[in-house]
Amino acid sequence: MRTSLLLCLLPSLLLAASPYPEKTPDTPGNRLIDRYFAEQTREITAENGLAQITTAADWEAKAPEYRRQLFEMLGLDPLPEKTPLNATKTGELKGDGYIVEKMHFQSMPGLYVTANLYLPDKVEKPLPTILYVCGHAVVVKDGVSLGNKAGYEHHGVWYARHGYACMIIDTVQLGEIRGEHHGTYSKGRWWWFSRGYTPAGLEAWSCIRALDYLETRKEVDKTRFGVTGRSGGGAYSWWITALDERIKASAPTAGVTDMQNQVIDGCVEGHCDCMFFLNTYRWNFERMVALAAPRPLLIVNTDKDTIFPIDGVFRIYQNVRKIYTLLGKEGNIGLQVSEGPHKDLQPLNIGAFHWFERFLKGADSMAVLDEGAKKTIQPASLRVFTEIPKDEINTKADETFVPMAKAPAPATNAADWSKQSDTWMQELKAKVFNGWPKDIASVNPQKESSAEVDGIRMTAYDFDSQSPFRLRLYIVHRDGLRAEDLQLVALNVLDEAGWDEFCATYHSRFGKLIEV
């Protein structure tokens, strides 16, 4: 006769694959989860921020690996092939002191980036050039998406009127071809994590390819690239600044805060997937910000922004400023704080304009700007496509941007299998389960109660899993069973549906042991 032991483990953490609620219900379980996230945030802040960097040599030794990790966490390692851009101009319009080229390029075959290139009406020599990346502006007319670039045209106009080239690029989510950023935010696409995909990586790649294109233009001085954008565009400014040292000055606006704000204070609930890399290496976000060093960096924010609160922004600024100080470049980092909410505001714009005047054109720090950014162009006139290309893959980019992993060849002998399985286990621990505790503490098991019904014995134990979780374990077996007689041990880790089924099966007979 086959002798079996059934172990049922009830986690305190029951997660459903559904959109995150606007307000997390206040329950004992959720309070426990909040406590867990607070503990993890404190651990990450202490161990994976910038506190361990004490000398310039420390930073210079570690920064290349940090940059490689960021490429990986954005789904860009290995980097996609740089295929022909197939840049195409579809039209042009003229304004007071500037022209706008309406164009598109393909960051990879079929992945279209729609863009407007703003230039002064007279260009006599290569110009400092701004890559402007867009936030979540929805610009639609008669059911047709004009792209979020049309919501930020006033920035392009200002730069062109003041001696810059400026390219404004659409995002995949809110461009003329509407793709998807909200995979885990609201679409239940949890497989993005397993695939190693985040739309943040796709937008970073669009930025890299935009620079590739701009380098081909005679109007562009490729030694003087700057990047800016607000909200989502602030985040993409961070990605390209950290990844690509062709960016010589940056002014990300309302695009970053620290783990305390995001996790403990709950700001993450208001954010799109495109705002985050897949945090395999458990970074605090200041590490990504510091990859701008020692290049000129202006961190721009408002004092009443509820999704990028100023306290977290200031903590990041203070910690990253230490890196600039170690590198002898403290004058290259600045913090611009203006009054207001999470909104495109003129004082924020002026700060960015002044920063680029100083660091891309050599203007004096007391230089006075003659005007702010003014909206003057009808959005519909900036549209690039009259028809959406039939070969576009923007609408399914999440399925192709990060290639699927290829199944490895099976081992053919015991030695190869041992080596292969050891490698897999190391990779699983380093990547998939990197958040597990490194030191396994005592589980402190405690027998709570036991009962026998109709020859079946159930025993309940409590044990420590990982701080702060103390879990319940139910052991079910034939009464009188000896350990040495066991032939099979089955461990069931129960989700909510499994717990409901377990209760339906056993509660009528073992109700005193089972806490419902």
Model-derived segments and spans:
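Bacterial N-terminal signal peptides
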Residues: 4-13
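Alpha/beta-hydrolase-fold serine-hydrolase catalytic core, especially in secreted/extracellular enzymes
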Residues: 17-113, 125, 285-287, 293-295, ...
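Cap/lid segment of the alpha/beta-hydrolase catalytic domain
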Residues: 124-222, 256-268, 274, 485-516
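Alpha/beta-hydrolase-fold catalytic nucleophile elbow
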Residues: 170, 228, 253-254, 300, ...
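Mobile cap/lid helix-loop segments that gate and shape the active-site cleft of serine hydrolases
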Residues: 193-194, 202, 248-290, 294-295, ...
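Alpha/beta-hydrolase fold nucleophile elbow
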Residues: 219-231
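Glycine-rich nucleophile elbow surrounding the catalytic serine of serine-hydrolase chemistry
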Residues: 229-239
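Conserved hydrolase catalytic core segment
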Residues: 242-248
